[in-house]
Amino acid sequence: SKEDNTWLPWDKSKGGYWSEGKHWSEILADETITYMEENKDSKEPLFMFCAFNAPHDPRQAPKEYVDMYDVDKISVPQNFLPVHPLGEQMKSGKNLRDEQLAPFPRTHYSVQKHRQEYYALITHMDAQVGRIIEALKRNG
């Protein structure tokens, strides 16, 4: 049911955002672009390593990116199971990491929400990569 979604991915109180309200992926892109602009006239070769945390948990994307994906149109995998098939043998119960990130047992809706959040986070990160590529083009 839709009542089993216990949090909002754009809730800044859950981490993923700096206290100033900006998403970590945006800050990382900003810092990368600033570094390129500050070094555009250097005669030395440029090497940068930009390591986004996205799309790892927690899946937190700005609301406008989550809204791009209609949760009711998102498919659930054919192999969907409400509980881990080996949970009893592993004696893990609800202690598996994934079991703490969603209602237990799983519902179709919770899987749709997780996918919606994941798609939104990837789309948001892709927009930041696009900003970096544009800065590369501008700065040579």
Task: Show the residue positions of the predicted features.
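Active-site-proximal cap/lid insertion segments
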Residues: 1-140
